[in-house]
Design a protein with these regions (language model features):
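Glycine-rich, low-complexity intrinsically disordered segments
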Residues: 1-168
Length: 168
């Protein structure tokens, strides 16, 4: 949550003759009231990677930032904002290696896709809110392994949902 607010707070900054002033929406103060405040340094979360089997995520779709979604203690921690862009992502494993390709949406990974090198994969992990690449790799390798055991398909296909101008 703090990693998302690190990005969103710039949307609420206003430059005045006295300096920068922030006009935060109520969700920001509710986070503070609930004790959600991180004092450790971190990299801001610039996007999220999601399955999208129903093709829900498109440019302009409104993002709802919730904790404990669809539960009694559900909590909106940031205001709704539109999706800026979406990219397809395809991950597969080769032993303990995670191979990652990215393409334009609806291109069905092919002509315009490109594979991320190790440095780009590290950036992807940080930008997706993981503390380091190993956490990211292990998270997605577990998902791929579980899917493989269920279906025989050892891969992950989803979307990178951007709320900033960043693209790969």
């Amino acid at each position: 949550m703090e990693k998302i607010w690190a990005v969103l707070q710039t949307r609420f900054a206003e430059i005045t003759p006295e300096g920068k002033k922030y006009l935060f929406p109520p969700e920001y103060f509710q986070c503070l009231d609930k004790g959600f405040q991180n004092t450790k340094p971190f990299h801001p979360k610039l996007h999220t990677i999601r399955l999208d089997e129903k093709d829900r995520w498109k440019t302009g779709t409104m993002i709802d930032f919730f904790i404990n979604c669809r539960q009694k203690d559900m909590f909106r921690f940031a205001p709704r904002i539109p999706v800026v862009s979406v990219q397809e992502i395809f991950m597969t494993r080769r032993g303990s290696i995670l191979e990652i390709s990215i393409a334009k949406v609806d291109s069905y990974i092919g002509d315009d896709d490109f594979q991320l090198d190790a440095f780009q994969q590290g950036d992807l992990a940080l930008n997706d809110g993981f503390d380091d690449y190993n956490d990211f790799r292990n998270y997605f390798l577990d998902i791929i392994e579980k899917k493989g055991k269920e279906t025989g398909n050892y891969w992950f296909k989803g979307k990178i949902i951007h709320w900033t101008a960043l693209r790969y």
